C-alpha cells in the first residue's frame, strides 16, 4: 500500500507540474503567473521528497516479486535485472516496438520496467536540480550557479529542464 500512495503522489505532482510548467512558459491567463510559479516550486519539492522516500522505502519495505505469491523481498531487488530474466531484454524491446505479438513472460516487473525504475529517480533528481538552478531565489547559490555555468548558461539549463519533462 505505501508504494501505491507514492505512485499516486508522483502522478498528481507530475501532471500538475506539467500544467504549471506550460502556464509559466506560455502565460495564457493574466494574474496567474505567481500562483503557477508557487505551485510549480511546491510540487517540485513534493516530487523530489516523494522520490527520496520511495527510494528509501525500496530498501526497507518488502513486496512480492511475483504475482500471487507470499514470498516477499525488499523492493529494490525487484528493480534490478536478475540473471534469470536479463536475457529477455531483446524480447521486451521487440514487444514494445511491435515487432513481436507475444508478451514476454516475466516476474513482477519486466526488464524495461526495471531499467526505468532505476532511471526515474535519477531523472527526478536532475530535474529538481535544474529547476532550482532556474528559480530566482536559488539560482545564484554557488552549487546551482556552477551547474549553470557548466552547461553554458541559463538557456542551456532551461533546455535541459524542458527536455527532462519529456
What would you call each of these model-derived segments?
Residues 1-166:
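Membrane-embedded alpha-helical bundles that constitute the cytochrome b-like, heme-associated redox core
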Amino acid at each position: 500500500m505505501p508504494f501505491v500512495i507514492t505512485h499516486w503522489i508522483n502522478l498528481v505532482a507530475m501532471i500538475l507540474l506539467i500544467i504549471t510548467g506550460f502556464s509559466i512558459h506560455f502565460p495564457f491567463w493574466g494574474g496567474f503567473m505567481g500562483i503557477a510559479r508557487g505551485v510549480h516550486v511546491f510540487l517540485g519539492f513534493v516530487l523530489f521528497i516523494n522520490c527520496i522516500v520511495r527510494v528509501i522505502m525500496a530498501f526497507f519495505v518488502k513486496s512480492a516479486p511475483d504475482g500471487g505469491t507470499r514470498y516477499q523481498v525488499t523492493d529494490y531487488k525487484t528493480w534490478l535485472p536478475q540473471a534469470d530474466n536479463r536475457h529477455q531484454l531483446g524480447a521486451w524491446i521487440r514487444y514494445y516496438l511491435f515487432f513481436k505479438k507475444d508478451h514476454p513472460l516475466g516476474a513482477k516487473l519486466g526488464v524495461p520496467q526495471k531499467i526505468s525504475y532505476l532511471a526515474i529517480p535519477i531523472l527526478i533528481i536532475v530535474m529538481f536540480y535544474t529547476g532550482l538552478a532556474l528559480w530566482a531565489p536559488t539560482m545564484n547559490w554557488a552549487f546551482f550557479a556552477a551547474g549553470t555555468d557548466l552547461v553554458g548558461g541559463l538557456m542551456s539549463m532551461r533546455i535541459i529542464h524542458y527536455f527532462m519533462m519529456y
